[in-house]
Amino acid sequence: MSLGGGNVPVLGAGGWGTALAVAVTRAGHRATLWARRPDFAARLASERENGEYLPGVLLPAEVSVTSDLTHAVAGADFALVVVPSVGVPDLLAALPRDLGIVLCAKGLAPDGGRLTDLARSLGFARVAVLSGPNHAEEVGRGLPAATVVASADLELAGKVQATLISPTLRVYTSADEVGVELGGVLKNVIALATGLVDGLKLGDNAKAALITRGLREMGRYLVSQGAHEDTVYGLSGLGDLVATATSRHSRNRAAGEAIARGEHPQQGGKVVEGLRTAGLLDAWASAHGHDLPIVHAVAKVASGEWTPDVGIRSLMGRGAKSELEE
């Protein structure tokens, strides 16, 4: 499926938005990168490099930059929405309802619900989610990577696939929108926990145990929400968890490490989705009687109610059980 070199709006000029705009050009298309701040957009257009969020990656000539949202989406079939989750509601409210929406943030709506549900509640009929083990620093440089676009609208998923697939980026489609979206949400919390382990210098055994039990916790939650179990072990589940929990590029892992050292978890103004997600998921689990022990521990530590040591002890002190026990 080809777009014939058409223009693709990329709404959000952070690191991931910038990397996706560059990826669009590698697939043979033009991209319009929208930045909310006019001064920032002007600087990007002039310098051709996002020194604030993705230094070292130059914007190709096929990427235009604007702060005019109407201009950015004019004539487009769909747009990649790449702002942090807290900014998604306001951005969606300003977009035409016949536009296809591809959500690229790995977070939850303000009420703790799914961003795809929020988009549909606002009147968007064509909605998809893009997720996978994709660090902007590597995708922007053209290092090999793979990702998943999921939607109930398979035609839209196919168009997004054609927009991004290239010799350096494998793009798979999926009909499991719930699993792909929520896998990207929950892995951020598990990555925060692995950062706590790193910051406390608890060793490789502890990290391996945390990641493995975290995957189990992810699986229970995703399946309870209607996801396919196979998705848990795909790129948007296990793949994204491995990348986020182990990489030096991971904001969430770095935030957990910073908390363990007694430092502020958000550095350089970059959004750490897992900090907010942990509290929302913990509140949901408590209200619905679900056992998400790692999420609970991270939420308590992130809120300052528990120290990192107390959080780890809460996990190590749980009752004895079978490994496969729910």
UniProtKB/Swiss-Prot annotation:
<comment type="similarity">
    <text>Belongs to the NAD-dependent glycerol-3-phosphate dehydrogenase family.</text>
</comment>
<dbReference type="GO" id="GO:0005829">
    <property type="term" value="C:cytosol"/>
</dbReference>
<dbReference type="Pfam" id="PF07479">
    <property type="entry name" value="NAD_Gly3P_dh_C"/>
</dbReference>
<dbReference type="GO" id="GO:0051287">
    <property type="term" value="F:NAD binding"/>
</dbReference>
<dbReference type="GO" id="GO:0046168">
    <property type="term" value="P:glycerol-3-phosphate catabolic process"/>
</dbReference>
<keyword id="KW-0521">NADP</keyword>
<feature type="binding site">
    <location>
        <position position="273"/>
    </location>
    <ligand>
        <name>NADPH</name>
    </ligand>
</feature>
<dbReference type="GO" id="GO:0005975">
    <property type="term" value="P:carbohydrate metabolic process"/>
</dbReference>
<feature type="binding site">
    <location>
        <position position="106"/>
    </location>
    <ligand>
        <name>sn-glycerol 3-phosphate</name>
    </ligand>
</feature>
<dbReference type="GO" id="GO:0047952">
    <property type="term" value="F:glycerol-3-phosphate dehydrogenase [NAD(P)+] activity"/>
</dbReference>
<feature type="binding site">
    <location>
        <position position="251"/>
    </location>
    <ligand>
        <name>NADPH</name>
    </ligand>
</feature>
<feature type="binding site">
    <location>
        <position position="132"/>
    </location>
    <ligand>
        <name>sn-glycerol 3-phosphate</name>
    </ligand>
</feature>
<dbReference type="InterPro" id="IPR011128">
    <property type="entry name" value="G3P_DH_NAD-dep_N"/>
</dbReference>
<keyword id="KW-0547">Nucleotide-binding</keyword>
<dbReference type="InterPro" id="IPR013328">
    <property type="entry name" value="6PGD_dom2"/>
</dbReference>
<feature type="binding site">
    <location>
        <position position="106"/>
    </location>
    <ligand>
        <name>NADPH</name>
    </ligand>
</feature>
<dbReference type="GO" id="GO:0006650">
    <property type="term" value="P:glycerophospholipid metabolic process"/>
</dbReference>
<dbReference type="InterPro" id="IPR006168">
    <property type="entry name" value="G3P_DH_NAD-dep"/>
</dbReference>
<feature type="binding site">
    <location>
        <position position="271"/>
    </location>
    <ligand>
        <name>NADPH</name>
    </ligand>
</feature>
<feature type="binding site">
    <location>
        <position position="37"/>
    </location>
    <ligand>
        <name>NADPH</name>
    </ligand>
</feature>
<feature type="binding site">
    <location>
        <position position="252"/>
    </location>
    <ligand>
        <name>sn-glycerol 3-phosphate</name>
    </ligand>
</feature>
<dbReference type="GO" id="GO:0008654">
    <property type="term" value="P:phospholipid biosynthetic process"/>
</dbReference>
<dbReference type="InterPro" id="IPR036291">
    <property type="entry name" value="NAD(P)-bd_dom_sf"/>
</dbReference>
<feature type="binding site">
    <location>
        <position position="240"/>
    </location>
    <ligand>
        <name>sn-glycerol 3-phosphate</name>
    </ligand>
</feature>
<feature type="binding site">
    <location>
        <position position="250"/>
    </location>
    <ligand>
        <name>sn-glycerol 3-phosphate</name>
    </ligand>
</feature>
<dbReference type="Pfam" id="PF01210">
    <property type="entry name" value="NAD_Gly3P_dh_N"/>
</dbReference>
<feature type="binding site">
    <location>
        <position position="251"/>
    </location>
    <ligand>
        <name>sn-glycerol 3-phosphate</name>
    </ligand>
</feature>
<keyword id="KW-0560">Oxidoreductase</keyword>
<feature type="binding site">
    <location>
        <position position="136"/>
    </location>
    <ligand>
        <name>NADPH</name>
    </ligand>
</feature>
<feature type="binding site">
    <location>
        <position position="187"/>
    </location>
    <ligand>
        <name>sn-glycerol 3-phosphate</name>
    </ligand>
</feature>
<keyword id="KW-0594">Phospholipid biosynthesis</keyword>
<keyword id="KW-1208">Phospholipid metabolism</keyword>
<dbReference type="GO" id="GO:0046167">
    <property type="term" value="P:glycerol-3-phosphate biosynthetic process"/>
</dbReference>
<feature type="binding site">
    <location>
        <position position="36"/>
    </location>
    <ligand>
        <name>NADPH</name>
    </ligand>
</feature>
<dbReference type="InterPro" id="IPR008927">
    <property type="entry name" value="6-PGluconate_DH-like_C_sf"/>
</dbReference>
<keyword id="KW-0443">Lipid metabolism</keyword>
<feature type="active site" description="Proton acceptor">
    <location>
        <position position="187"/>
    </location>
</feature>
<feature type="binding site">
    <location>
        <position position="16"/>
    </location>
    <ligand>
        <name>NADPH</name>
    </ligand>
</feature>
<dbReference type="InterPro" id="IPR006109">
    <property type="entry name" value="G3P_DH_NAD-dep_C"/>
</dbReference>
<comment type="pathway">
    <text>Membrane lipid metabolism; glycerophospholipid metabolism.</text>
</comment>
<keyword id="KW-0963">Cytoplasm</keyword>
<keyword id="KW-0444">Lipid biosynthesis</keyword>
